[in-house]
Amino acid sequence: MRDPVETYMNLVPMVVEQTNRGERAYDIFSRLLKERIIFLTGPVEDGMSTLVVAQLLFLEAENPKKEISMYINSPGGVVTSGLAIYDTMQFIRPPVSTLCTGQAASMGSLLLAAGEKDMRFSLPNARIMVHQPSGGFQGQATDIMLHAQEILNLKKRLNEIYVKHTGQTYKTIEDALERDKFLTANDAKEFGLVDRVIDKRAEEPAAAKTQ
């Protein structure tokens, strides 16, 4: 028998729109995708990464100039999956706005910082966490050495990406990511991960209330 809580959590709300051809039903995420809103929620892994990349490419094809909004609530996950999303965000022509709701940890924080400059936001009670990549390996000693070198290469590359998007020095980023570093929304703003902390939706983006 399936867990009723799990069943409930897997239910996706449907919304109904009136069109010239009658009623049309969408799941809530598809409806918001029509508004150029992408949800990046849960662990970052290959399946989720593929869906996010596909949505980014679809919205670029729909309109190569209009802004895309990405709402992030993620504990992080697989580095290569996150970098696939990151590279696509940089590759496509539309500017990508990012907004942290809940948390943006590990790869989630990197994707939050990767939004278009001056278009990276956080809600006031969101939490952001940055740290260096981690991994566990087993096998022959030579293979373990190769994996260790690869994770050091990834660490260096991730540090460089944070430097690019935060404006911090490499040494500052390296020191900050040495251990899990937890940040409030305002701390993340001071660190350069986001540009503004917003607590109300404004009628005009430029008029958004900031902290």
UniProtKB/Swiss-Prot annotation:
GO terms for molecular function: ATP-dependent peptidase activity; ATPase binding; serine-type endopeptidase activity. Its EC number is 3.4.21.92. Keywords: Cytoplasm, Hydrolase, Protease, Serine protease. One of its GO terms (biological process) is protein quality control for misfolded or incompletely synthesized proteins. It comes from the Bacteria. GO terms for cellular component: cytoplasm; endopeptidase Clp complex. This is ATP-dependent Clp protease proteolytic subunit 2. InterPro entries: ClpP (IPR001907), ClpP/crotonase-like_dom_sf (IPR029045), ClpP/TepA (IPR023562), ClpP_His_AS (IPR033135). PROSITE patterns: CLP_PROTEASE_HIS (PS00382). Belongs to the peptidase S14 family. It comes from Bradyrhizobium diazoefficiens (strain JCM 10833 / BCRC 13528 / IAM 13628 / NBRC 14792 / USDA 110). CDD domains: S14_ClpP_2 (cd07017). Transmembrane segments: none annotated. It catalyses: Hydrolysis of proteins to small peptides in the presence of ATP and magnesium. alpha-casein is the usual test substrate. In the absence of ATP, only oligopeptides shorter than five residues are hydrolyzed (such as succinyl-Leu-Tyr-|-NHMec, and Leu-Tyr-Leu-|-Tyr-Trp, in which cleavage of the -Tyr-|-Leu- and -Tyr-|-Trp bonds also occurs). Fourteen ClpP subunits assemble into 2 heptameric rings which stack back to back to give a disk-like structure with a central cavity, resembling the structure of eukaryotic proteasomes. Cleaves peptides in various proteins in a process that requires ATP hydrolysis. Has a chymotrypsin-like activity. Plays a major role in the degradation of misfolded proteins. It is found in: Cytoplasm. Signal peptide: none annotated. The active site is at residues 106, 131. The keyword Transcription regulation does not apply. Its main location: cytoplasm.
